[in-house]
Structures are given as structure tokens and as C-alpha cells.
């Protein structure tokens, strides 16, 4: 079940709203239980056989969290956090990487069979959430959660369960115990959810057709290859940020406030800035739980480079068990090292437009690695972008450019902080009309977007979120 499906919008969500809000606010435990039950049902709809795996992950992190608490001796606390890391990452490693490493072993020793393992939905996300809780307890950054049901709600809460953002326990710990739902909060959450739904249905799914056509073409022309790469650059942003918007909006409807996961990354003027704005919950997770414990940048240059290499190798591997993702992570490692130690100062002296062009060109290249099925396919596509087909234009690029130019233009505008600039301008005017627009404008716009999105939903084909496979 996905947020942009009829079953979720027409059946799951309305039933949850009715059961949740019919319970009086003072019965917080009952409301939490309803959220937990629906979250488990939500996950079971996508992979019922893996529901036990997620429950096992919850039990592991609950027990290890108790061991890592301050009441125990240091050796017991270390054992608790170590056990959580070994078991949690062990399960993640088996289900996500057994096939990948098995294929490499099979190539060297054909008598070793390749494990046939199905990847559970959202395992990368709920594993990282559970592990961060135990580590925070061990560091005394979070209190031990003694209620297994409350910890289960934190790990399995359906808005961010299968595709993020990765929510820290400290972000929602107080709201699990005591939160204040209101009409204004519910309304703001609904508007955020509907804007995310529109991103997915009206923009991401549209440009996905261009990207799919270009990447599946046997020998695309130069312009078609570039159009496909740019289209996928828009697709992955509007697809993933749409899910984050919808998750943040849903959480807010129930009184939870998740941190932002994107901050207009395509306005960045460097790769360093890009990663401060893109998938913020993942980059900060690796910063706090891998990079800083390794020594961060408070060490020699050689050690700092090694720390960054480890982080970006793991970042690539986290996204998937393939050489494409590993090379994708190492691509950003090279660029970040270059900006930090080689050409960063020279880059900062360039005009802003050139800085932006440099950043987006390198980001587009990175998404080719991300989108291609194999490393060989990525290299072939790069060759097509620089003329290997011998055709510069071709009929297909003309067709797709004419067919999808409105969506591509909307993507260009929506990738900019236009909404923020408009809100700032209206707030500065501080007139009766501007205040009315600030209050009613987003609500009216979200209703219009809901109508358009629903039309696409009932007439279009199923197109799952990209990050579901991670």
C-alpha cells in the first residue's frame, strides 16, 4: 500500500481518522494503540511475511535499549549497544546484501550457490531508526523507553516506515507520551500531504515517462540522453521529497512533528551545500553515528579523508547492493574531498550562476549512475550523452519534449523556493488581503491539486515511490 493509492486514500486513511479521533484525547494510550495497529496493518499490506521481521527488530531494540540504559554497569551498556548493532545490521546485511556478495563468491567459486533473498520493504529505514534509539540511550541523549508498545509505535509508525524520513527517537519521544492535536495542526498537515501527493502524481510520475523512455532506448540521441538524465533528476527529487512531504503532513495530522528532509537541494552552489539540503535525515544519521565517532574532521587530513571514504562507501551501499550505488557514493566522496581540499576556494570565487551550473551538472551525472540498471549500462548511457549514437537530435526527443514540456517547466519552477518567497513577500506587506491569502491560499491550492491528483490517480498506471526499494 502506498500513499498515492486509492486503497490508502479512500479506505485506510478515513478508517484511521474515524477510529483515532473518536477516542477522547485523554485516552492517549488508546490512541497510540490504534496508530500502532494501523501501522502494523499498513506494513503487512506491503509484505505480510516480513511483519514478523519488523516485530523482531522492535524486540531487539527494546531489549538492547533496556541493557544500554544508565542503570547498568558500563560493560552491560556496551554489550547492549553492541548487540543491537550486530543483530540489527546483521539482519539488514543478510536480507539486503546476501545476494550481492553471494554472486561475487559464486563467480569465483561456482559450487557456492547464490542466496535467493527477498528484500523486505523499508528495512533500511526501520533498522536505522531502531539502532539510533539504542545508541542515543547509550550516550544518555535519550531516556530508556520502558513501554514496548511506545517503542513499537516509534519504529513502526506508518508515515515514515517504508521510505523515511529517518526520524530520531529524541524528535518524537515527548509527543509519543503527550501531543496536542488540533484543527489548525490537522489542516496544516493535510495541506502538506496534498502538496506532496501532487508532487508525486502530477510531476514525478509525468517526467518518469521521459526518463524511462530514454534509459530504455537502445541508442538514444545526444539530446534525448540529456533529456532523460534531466528528467530523472527531477523525478527522483519530486518522488522522494513528495513522500517526505506526505509523511511529515500525516505525522502532523496526528500531532507529531518530524524534521525536514529536503531544503530545495537543486538551488545549491556546491556539492557540499547539496548534501546539506538533500535527504537530510540520512546524511545527519551518518554524520552523528559514523563520521563523528570515527573522528570526524578533528584529526589528520589523511584520517579525515579515510573517514569520509567510509561514510560515502556506506552511504552508497545503504541505497542498494550493486556497484552502481557504491560508485554513486564514491562519486560524491571524490567531489566532496575535491571541494574541501582542492578547488573549493576557487569555486567560491566563481559567479553564482557558474557555481550552480557546476553543481547541477555533477548531480545529473550522479543520477545516471543511480538510475541505470548496471554499471555497464551507466557507462553506455554516459557515452550516449556525449554522442556515441552519432545522432544529435532525433524524432523521439522532439516528441517527448513537446509532449512533456509543461511538466518539465513546472518542475523547474517547483524546484525553486517560490512558495517561501511568496509567503515572505505577503508577510512583509501585512495587509488584510495578504493575510487572507496566506491563510486561505494554501488550502484552496491544495484542494485544486487534490482534484488534479485524483484524476491522475484513477486514470493512470501504478508507479511506486523510488525509495521503497531501499
Regions found by a protein language model. Give the residues of each.
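Membrane-embedded transmembrane alpha-helical bundles that form the catalytic cores
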Residues: 1-469
Amino acid at each position: 500500500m502506498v500513499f498515492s493509492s486509492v486503497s490508502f486514500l479512500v479506505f485506510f486513511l478515513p478508517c484511521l481518522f474515524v477510529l483515532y479521533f473518536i477516542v477522547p484525547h485523554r485516552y492517549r494510550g488508546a490512541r497510540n494503540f490504534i496508530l500502532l495497529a494501523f501501522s502494523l496493518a499498513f506494513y503487512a499490506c506491503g509484505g505480510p511475511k516480513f511483519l514478523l521481521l519488523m516485530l523482531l527488530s522492535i524486540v531487539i531494540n527494546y531489549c538492547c535499549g533496556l541493557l544500554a540504559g544508565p542503570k547498568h554497569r558500563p560493560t552491560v551498556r556496551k554489550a547492549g549497544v553492541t548487540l543491537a548493532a550486530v543483530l540489527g545490521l546483521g539482519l539488514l546485511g543478510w536480507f539486503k546484501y546476501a545476494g550481492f556478495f553471494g554472486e561475487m563468491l559464486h563467480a569465483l567459486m561456482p559450487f557456492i550457490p547464490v542466496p535467493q533473498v527477498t528484500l523486505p520493504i523499508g528495512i533500511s529505514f526501520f533498522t536505522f531508526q531502531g539502532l539510533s534509539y539504542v545508541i542515543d540511550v547509550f550516550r544518555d541523549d535519550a531516556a530508556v523507553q520502558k513501554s514496548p508498545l511506545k517503542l513499537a509505535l516509534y519504529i513502526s509508525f506508518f508515515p515514515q516506515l517504508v521510505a523515511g524520513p529517518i526520524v530520531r527517537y529524541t524528535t518524537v519521544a515527548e509527543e509519543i507520551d503527550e501531543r496536542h492535536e488540533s484543527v489548525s495542526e490537522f489542516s496544516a498537515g493535510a495541506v502538506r500531504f496534498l502538496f506532496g501527493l501532487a508532487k508525486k502524481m502530477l510531476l514525478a510520475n509525468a517526467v518518469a515517462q521521459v526518463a524511462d523512455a530514454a534509459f530504455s532506448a537502445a541508442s538514444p540521441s545526444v539530446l534525448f540522453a540529456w533529456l532523460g538524465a534531466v528528467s530523472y533528476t527531477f523525478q527522483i527529487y519530486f518522488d522522494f521529497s513528495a513522500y517526505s512531504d506526505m509523511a511529515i503532513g500525516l505525522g502532523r495530522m496526528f500531532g507529531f512533528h518530524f524534521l525536514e528532509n529536503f531544503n530545495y537541494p537543486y538551488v545549491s552552489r556546491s556539492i557540499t551545500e547539496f548534501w546539506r539540503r538533500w535527504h537530510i535525515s540520512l546524511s545527519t544519521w551518518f554524520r552523528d553515528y559514523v563520521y563523528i565517532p570515527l573522528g570526524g574532521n578533528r584529526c589528520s587530513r589523511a584520517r579525515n579523508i579515510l573517514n569520509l571514504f567510509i561514510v560515502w562507501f556506506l552511504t552508497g551501499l545503504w541505497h542498494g547492493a550493486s556497484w552502481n550505488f557504491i560508485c554513486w557514493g564514491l562519486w560524491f566522496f571524490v567531489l566532496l574531498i575535491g571541494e574541501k581540499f582542492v578547488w573549493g576556494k576557487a569555486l567560491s570565487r566563481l559567479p553564482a550562476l557558474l557555481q550552480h551550473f557546476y553543481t547541477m551538472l555533477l548531480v545529473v551525472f550522479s543520477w545516471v549512475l543511480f538510475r541505470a540498471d548496471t554499471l555497464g549500462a551507466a557507462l553506455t548511457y554516459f557515452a550516449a550523452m556525449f554522442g556515441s549514437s552519432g545522432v544529435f537530435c532525433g524524432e523521439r526527443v522532439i516528441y517527448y519534449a513537446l509532449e512533456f514540456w509543461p511538466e518539465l517547466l513546472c518542475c523547474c519552477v517547483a524546484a525553486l523556493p517560490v512558495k517561501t518567497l511568496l509567503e515572505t513577500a505577503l508577510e512583509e506587506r501585512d495587509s488584510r488581503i495578504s493575510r487572507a491569502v496566506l491563510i486561505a491560499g494554501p488550502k484552496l491550492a491544495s484542494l485544486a491539486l487534490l482534484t488534479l491528483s485524483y484524476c491522475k490517480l484513477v486514470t493512470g498506471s501504478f508507479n511506486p515511490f523510488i525509495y521503497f526499494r531501499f
